[in-house]
Regions:
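Core SAM-dependent methyltransferase catalytic element
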Residues: 204-225
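Rossmann-like AdoMet
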Residues: 1-56, 74-107
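A short SAM/SAH-binding and catalytic strip from SAM-dependent methyltransferases
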Residues: 154-168
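Conserved beta-strand signature within the Rossmann-like core of class I S-adenosyl-L-methionine
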Residues: 155-157, 184-192
C-alpha cells in the first residue's frame, strides 16, 4: 500500500500525495476539473462524438483514487453505450483512504457513494458488473508485466505519474505495447505534453494533437491511431 496523504485541490476535490514518489495523483489546481477536461471531455466524449459506437472498451493506466473510473461511470449512467473498463494499478490505496475521499459528495449524484465504494471493492483480475452497462476489470500489477493483447481498446486513459517520476512507464517500448493494444481509430489521452513523449508517439505512427490543458496546465495530448 502506498504512503499517501490526502490533499484538497483548488476546485475543492481531493487528491493524494504519494510520499515515496513525491508527486500528486492529480493537478493541485483541481483534481476533478483536470480529470473531466483531459479524460472525459477530450477523451470519452470526443470518441463518442466521432464514432457513435454502441460499446466502448477503455484501458486506464493508473486506477489510483478511482476518480477517472468514477467519472466515466457517472457518464455511463446517462448513456445507452455499453462500457468495458480495464484499469491497471500496481499499488492500491487502502480502504481507509478510499472512505475519506470526497468525490461522491463533490459530484453529488444519486447512488454515487455506493457506486464509488463498489468500484473500489471490485475484485482484481476478473470482470465485475458495476451497473448493467458498465463492466470493470481491475488488473493488479505493472504495465510492463500485464498482457494487453492486440487491438483491444477504443480509448486509453494514460494516467501514470509523470515521466520525471516514473520514466519506465513513458519508455517508447511501453508506449508501443499500449499502441498495439489500441484498435484502429482508437484514441489515447493524457495530461502530459512533454516533447519527447510526443515524438515517441509520432514514431509509433500515432497522430498527435496538442490541446489546451486544464486550469493550471498549458497543454495536454490526444493521440489518434
Amino acid at each position: 500500500m502506498p504512503n499517501v496523504e490526502i490533499i484538497v485541490t483548488s476546485d475543492g476535490s481531493h487528491s493524494l500525495r504519494n510520499m515515496e514518489v513525491d508527486d500528486t495523483y492529480h493537478s493541485i489546481h483541481g483534481a476533478v476539473q483536470e480529470s473531466v477536461h483531459v479524460f472525459i471531455k477530450n477523451g470519452l466524449m470526443f470518441f463518442e462524438n466521432q464514432n457513435h459506437p454502441s460499446e466502448i472498451r477503455i484501458l486506464e493506466v493508473g486506477f489510483g483514487t478511482g476518480l477517472n473510473a468514477f467519472l466515466t461511470l457517472k457518464h455511463a449512467l446517462g448513456s445507452k453505450l455499453q462500457f468495458h473498463y480495464t484499469s491497471l494499478e500496481v499499488d492500491p490505496i487502502t480502504k481507509q483512504t478510499i472512505q475519506q475521499l470526497n468525490y461522491p459528495e463533490f459530484l453529488d449524484f444519486v447512488g454515487g457513494t455506493s457506486l464509488f465504494q463498489k468500484l473500489h471493492a471490485a475484485s482484481w483480475s476478473q470482470e465485475d458488473e458495476i451497473v448493467n452497462n458498465f463492466v470493470l476489470k481491475k488488473q493488479l500489477g505493472r504495465l510492463q508485466d500485464i498482457a494487453l493483447g492486440d487491438q483491444q481498446f477504443d480509448l486509453v486513459y494514460f494516467d501514470a505519474f509523470g515521466p520525471a517520476k516514473q520514466p519506465e512507464l513513458w519508455d517508447v517500448g511501453i508506449l508501443k505495447k499500449v499502441e498495439q493494444s489500441m484498435k484502429q481509430g482508437a484514441v489515447l489521452v493524457t495530461y502530459c505534453a512533454k516533447g519527447q513523449f510526443k515524438r515517441d508517439l509520432r514514431s509509433l505512427a500515432l497522430r498527435v494533437q496538442t490541446l489546451p490543458g486544464p486550469p493550471g496546465k498549458k497543454e495536454m495530448v490526444r493521440a489518434l491511431k
